[in-house]
Amino acid sequence: MVNRKDISLNYNRRESTTSVVGSLGVGSTYPIRIQTMANTDTNDIEASVAQAKRCFEAGTELVRFTTQGSRETESLREIRNRLQGYGPLVADVHFNPNVADLAAQYVEKVRINPGNYVDPARVFKHIEYTDEEYQAELQRLRERFTRLLNICKEHSTALRIGVNHGSLSDRIMSRYGDTPAGMVESCMEFLRVAVDEHFQNIVLSIKASNTRIMAETVRLLVAQMDKENMHFPLHLGVTEAGEGEDGRIKSAVGIGSLLADGIGDTIRVSLSEAPEAEIPVARALRDYFADPESIRYHGVSVAIEGDTVVYESDQTEWAMMQLQAAAECGKWLLGEQKQVRLANNHFDEEKLRTLEKDILQAAGLIRYKTEYVSCPSCGRTLFNIEEVIREVRAATGHLKGLKIAVMGCIVNGPGEMADADYGYVGAGRGRISLYRRKECVLKNIPQEEAVAALLELIKQDTNNK
């Protein structure tokens, strides 16, 4: 007989310092903050303002905008002017530190990506560095990053250091590999400079589309910060989680696994849908753990039986049952447990068994149906990602066991989908590139031909096996 260990459900926040984003405090002395990212063209000021208002009215507390260049930065300045009184805005900057310098003068927060802030765009090549060359690169990083820190100090601008698994620099990859340790070091390089420069107004994120890698890396970052006496607030999210029920369950597994241990000061549920659709999901996850009146503390029991986590709930809403079961079980399934058993008298057995499989797939333990990785899209995406996902799903849904990525652009696309079997990546207006794992096999083909070409590629590979 398998021993049963009942789990005591409690919630204790990890202590973190405070970051001030406009008038919004982020850190362990404040509620977990909810945020989203606009998917409009930042230069379309009317559409961007309208979408941001919808998001704030839906309950988000921050809205992030893609900020590719100086034109987008000036557009964001006008968007900021039109949204006075709604909430803080965040500029999302990749590849161009000069844009970050400018944006830091206009909005309450700037996000930079260590993988492409000073290092050149990733080309997936191993580059050998001597110790002297590596240190020279770190000194270059220090000099350039210090300039941004000084601007942020002058304008009371918060900074998010946001590492993505899909966009680690070739420099980091060459020394640490495609590993959680590499992601953590990519972040710590910047944190050490900030601490040396006495800049504390920082929030960190360290994300991946793989829930197991995401959770492991965040925990490793917390441990490394503790070793170096740093306690910055953390933003949580699963990149490219997808859409619909699968996207929600995957986000819940990843984010919930950390919230369950009190890790996380702000969250975003990244869905390939309208950004305002993300907010109720994020709120539900936050409230499940942080609200003492939540059903978690009055109608849920969790137990461990061998390699199985057992989750019993009185939840009467199916959408909430999906989120809460995935969030609660995520911690255990991304740890030592390999199976899940759900019990709820309000729902039939078939529904519960399917949810069990969906949660196991989100945790990377099985793949019983086609898995889709898709980004939430942003102003860099030049096609309607929701329509494309539906088209790709309709064409490939019968291909059980495959993992297919649909990515809006090249910022995270090739990297985040590296463990996908095939990838559909935006390459320009009306143009798509198709990937087999990391290899680009068809470049800049017309969008209207892309799904058929993807199917043909899969067919050829299947026939050649």
Model-predicted regions and their roles:
Residues 28-32, 59-61, 84-89, 106-108, ...:
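Short, well-ordered coil/turn segments that N-cap beta-strands
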Residues 42-54, 95-100, 187, 251-255, ...:
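Short, acidic/polar
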Residues 48-66:
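Catalytic domains of carbohydrate-active enzymes, especially glycoside hydrolases
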Residues 60-189, 315, 319:
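Active-site beta->alpha loop and helix N-cap motifs at the rims of alpha/beta catalytic domains
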